[in-house]
């Protein structure tokens, strides 16, 4: 998660400074008392200011994972930062990560109750933001067994296959219509990846297809959906004044709570329209032979009683969560993968050579081909190592006192796992900042990304690991293989790798590439 420090006006600070100081002193005395009879506390990073702690370090132009990585070089693999009256433990070491996800997995399976999380997730009804407990366990089981199981993904395989075929054909038609004198067309690939992934996940979850249609209603709904999704990722990627100082929430400094609630309401309106449409079809008997996730949720919740929320809220929250996670993460990862290939054309050529050997140029890539593309899988793994979609993993909170690496960690401490730093450990990876897929065919060929090897955990690990890992590991190589097999892709200049802040770390600038077909016209 990226934190953005929102300014506090000097006048307001003057009015509340005395109260803040008293609260700060009380918190420090309480923290000192809590650790006095325990193991030693983790070191605190230097540079903290009175009252606000380290918030000033997190508000500059440097991205948070890089700032925290620099602090780890000074403070060690585990250290504390203070965010107002909150404190967070920053971990940057795979051995400590292993201890976290084995000995302390239950204790770190909850989420901090941040303002944006509360407002955007139906008061924590979304499984991605729910605190650890009976509700989360039952919902996670339902999602894993009924929605994202291997069997369910196999049943819906034709969706990702057909949408990929359609998107490749649209790219080819664009080339036919707009190619330049040298036989290339310039394409912005972030948008292409985004439209493809959103179509796939929307069809799976809500039976919708927004992009590539001429229906004006669908296009308007698509714009609303994209705007609402953009708002979700913007606001959940912020650390607000009210998060660092909960007792100031009533002031709504900067009007952010009002904006967050407006964005959440728009997302809910869209989900409510989907829900009512599905309910009308069920009541009229017009149920499709292929049920999407919303159909399944409506059926499943007739027989399951989840505590704390009504069935409609659970259905909407779960479907939105699946759409947001599935579309955004895959788009971010495909964008970074292609960006890396543009800056390493020799690796791109090797990937295409493998495709020509395993698939040939007389047909298109089938899903059955993917298992044979070892070098392509190595490219995906290396991208996930260097550019995990969420550089700091999902934010967590200790629900009980713990011991980690000999340090005492108090209940209520937030956990920040710096995957960006952890997965570039020079003790594990030679030349850790270099893009070298070959390492996954030689020295690290036995490592996977499913949370079993703590040197490489881009999807997290333990109880709170990403439930969509299997889906992501199907989409990423399949889309990439089809794209590289169908087109020659290049750039006139080096691709900009600037990252943007947020809950997921996307490419800050467009990904403009030149494409031309490499197969016979009848194959598109």
From Swiss-Prot:
EC annotation from Swiss-Prot or TrEMBL: 1.14.14.189
Catalytic activity: strychnine + reduced [NADPH--hemoprotein reductase] + O2 = 10-hydroxystrychnine + oxidized [NADPH--hemoprotein reductase] + H2O + H(+)
Species name: Strychnos nux-vomica (Poison nut)
Key words, A-Z: Heme, Iron, Membrane, Metal-binding, Monooxygenase, Oxidoreductase, Transmembrane, Transmembrane helix
Recorded metabolic or biological pathway in which this protein acts: Alkaloid biosynthesis
GO terms (BP aspect): alkaloid biosynthetic process
Protein name: Strychnine-10-hydroxylase
Record PROSITE patterns: CYTOCHROME_P450
């Amino acid at each position: 998660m990226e934190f953005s420090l929102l300014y506090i006006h000097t006048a307001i600070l003057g009015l509340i400074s005395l109260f803040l100081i008293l609260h700060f002193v009380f918190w420090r005395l309480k923290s000192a008392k809590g650790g006095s009879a325990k193991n030693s506390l983790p070191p605190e990073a230097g540079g903290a200011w009175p009252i606000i702690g380290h918030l000033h370090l997190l508000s500059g132009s440097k991205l948070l994972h890089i700032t925290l990585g620099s602090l780890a070089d000074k403070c060690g693999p585990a250290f504390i930062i203070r965010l107002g009256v909150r404190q967070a433990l920053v971990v940057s070491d795979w051995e400590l990560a292993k201890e976290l996800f084995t000995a302390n997995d239950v204790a770190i399976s909850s989420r901090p109750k941040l303002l944006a999380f509360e407002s955007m997730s139906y008061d924590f009804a979304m499984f991605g933001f729910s605190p650890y407990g009976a509700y989360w366990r039952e919902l996670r089981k339902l999602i894993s067994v009924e929605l994202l199981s291997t069997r369910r993904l196999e049943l819906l395989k034709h969706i990702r296959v057909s949408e990929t075929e359609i998107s490749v054909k649209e790219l080819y038609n664009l080339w036919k219509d707009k190619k330049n004198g040298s036989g290339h067309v310039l394409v912005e690939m972030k948008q292409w990846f985004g439209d493809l992934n959103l179509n796939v996940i929307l069809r799976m979850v809500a039976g919708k297809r927004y992009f590539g249609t001429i229906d004006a209603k669908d296009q308007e709904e698509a714009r609303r959906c994209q705007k609402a999704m953009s708002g979700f990722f913007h606001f959940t990627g912020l650390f607000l004044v009210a998060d660092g100082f909960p007792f100031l929430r009533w002031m709504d400094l900067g009007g952010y709570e009002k904006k967050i609630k407006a964005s959440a309401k728009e997302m809910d309106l869209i989900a409510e329209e989907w829900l009512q449409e599905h309910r009308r079809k069920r009541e009229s008997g017009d149920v499709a032979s292929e049920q999407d996730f919303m159909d399944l949720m409506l059926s499943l919740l007739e027989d399951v009683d989840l505590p704390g929320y009504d069935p409609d809220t659970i259905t909407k929250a779960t479907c939105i969560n699946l759409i947001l996670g599935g579309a955004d993460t895959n788009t971010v990862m495909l964008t970074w993968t292609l960006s890396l290939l543009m800056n390493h054309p020799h690796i791109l050529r090797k990937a295409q050579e493998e495709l020509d050997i395993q698939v040939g140029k007389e047909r298109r890539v089938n899903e059955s081909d993917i298992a044979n593309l070892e070098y392509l899988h190595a490219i995906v793994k290396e991208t996930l190592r260097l550019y995990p979609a969420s550089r700091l993993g999902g934010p967590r909170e200790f629900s009980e006192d713990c011991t980690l690496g000999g340090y005492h960690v108090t209940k209520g401490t937030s956990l920040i796992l710096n995957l960006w730093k952890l997965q570039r450990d020079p003790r594990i990876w030679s030349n850790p900042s270099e893009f070298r897929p070959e390492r996954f065919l030689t020295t690290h060929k036995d490592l996977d990304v499913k949370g079993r090897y703590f040197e490489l955990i881009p999807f997290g690990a333990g109880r709170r690991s990403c439930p969509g890992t299997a889906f992501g590991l199907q989409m990423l190589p399949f889309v990439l293989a089809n794209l590289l097999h169908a087109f020659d892709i290049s750039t006139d200049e080096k691709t900009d790798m600037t990252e943007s802040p947020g809950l997921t770390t996307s490419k800050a600038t467009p990904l403009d590439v030149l494409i031309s077909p490499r197969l016979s016209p009848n194959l598109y």
